[in-house]
UniProtKB/Swiss-Prot annotation:
Pfam families: ZF-HD_dimer
Protein name: Zinc-finger homeodomain protein 3
Subcellular location field: Nucleus
Organism annotation: Oryza sativa subsp. japonica
Disulfide bridges in this chain: none
């Protein structure tokens, strides 16, 4: 029995597994002729083991990647020490100096400024950077085929370069950019945040003033149906009416209860005009504000007390005169 096509799982080489350039490997097999022993079990195509030459090339690729990592240099420190107070201040460190041996935790901290290495600007050496595109015969991953197979096309995903270091922007720059954006967009957020002011007509003001005087400048004691009906008639909302009454309570109410002297003089001069119709609600408010009159019994009691005091003083005067005459005799 021919078992040449049934091959087990191949072991994964350590050097190939550790390589950062190990990507997806797709093999497109073009078979000519009938299905021979080249097809694996269950329709799978098994790849031959990696030859020594390919392993050497993989090791060489790993060395190049390590040298590219070592080529990165960290320049000036960008840590903002005044971010808590909204300012921008750096320590002036010009280049990262490791504080310990390579591989230790102290190696990630700068011995000059004491900041972490990530705060320093990262600079990559363009000459030592690994190329982004390789041919299929330069990088061979797990299960790759040796050179000379014209029927296999290898597509490798090369590991991308490390992401660029995030620049720490000062708060002043960020605020400036935001203000520039706001200035570049007229009618944007500033107009949206502007409070809308309600404008009333003269008729609405007169009707709201009369309603406020009738209810005593308060809406708590009224039924909601009455207030809602009035708001629908005037064309304002309940909240708007309440705010208007609160804003004009100390001005319009006092003006109507205590008119100015000029207005009173004008009313006196206009004798021919008929007197205005008295408002019962206004009369009640005026009566409540006036002090209560003193009772008549209090006046009578005070007059009686004064008369009794005068009579007692006259009696004492007579007694004093009699005593004086007796002493002289």
């Amino acid at each position: 029995m021919d078992l040449s096509g049934a091959q087990g799982e191949l072991p994964l080489p350590m050097h190939a597994a550790a390589s950062p350039y190990l990507g997806l490997h797709h093999d497109h097999h073009h078979h000519h002729g009938g299905g021979g022993g080249g097809g694996g079990m269950n329709g799978r195509h098994m790849s031959p083991p990696t030859p020594p030459a390919a392993a050497e090339e993989s090791k060489a690729v790993v060395v190049v990647s390590s040298s590219a990592t070592a080529a990165a240099r960290y320049r000036e420190c960008l840590k903002n020490h005044a971010a808590a107070i909204g300012g921008s201040a750096t320590d002036g460190c010009g280049e990262f100096m490791p504080g310990g041996e390579e591989g230790s935790l102290d190696a990630l901290r700068c011995s000059a400024c004491g900041c972490h290495r990530n705060f320093h600007r990262k600079e990559l050496d363009a000459a030592a950077a690994p190329p982004l595109h390789h041919h299929h015969h330069q990088l061979l991953g797990v299960g790759a085929h040796p050179r000379g197979h014209g029927h296999h096309h290898h597509h490798l995903l090369v590991a991308a370069l490390p992401p660029p270091t995030r620049m720490v922007m000062p708060l002043s720059a960020m605020h400036t950019s935001e203000s520039d954006d706001a200035a570049a967009r007229p009618g944007g957020g500033a107009a949206a945040r502007k409070r809308f002011r309600t404008k009333f007509t003269a008729e609405q003001k007169a009707r709201m003033l009369g309603f406020a005087e009738e209810v005593g400048w308060r809406l708590q004691k009224l039924e909601d149906a009455v207030v809602q009906r009035f708001c629908q008639e005037v064309g304002v909302k309940r909240r708007v009416l309440k705010v208007w009454m609160h804003n004009n309570k100390h001005t319009l109410a006092r003006r109507h209860l205590h008119p100015s002297p000029a207005a009173a003089a004008g009313d006196d001069d206009d004798d021919g005009a008929p007197p205005p119709h008295p408002d019962p609600r206004r009369r009640e408010l005026a009566a409540a504000a006036a002090p209560p009159p003193a009772p008549v019994t209090q006046h009578i009691k005070k007059s009686v007390d004064n008369k009794s005091l005068i009579s007692s003083l006259a009696a004492l005067h007579c007694i004093a005169l009699l005593l004086f005459h007796q002493i002289d005799a």
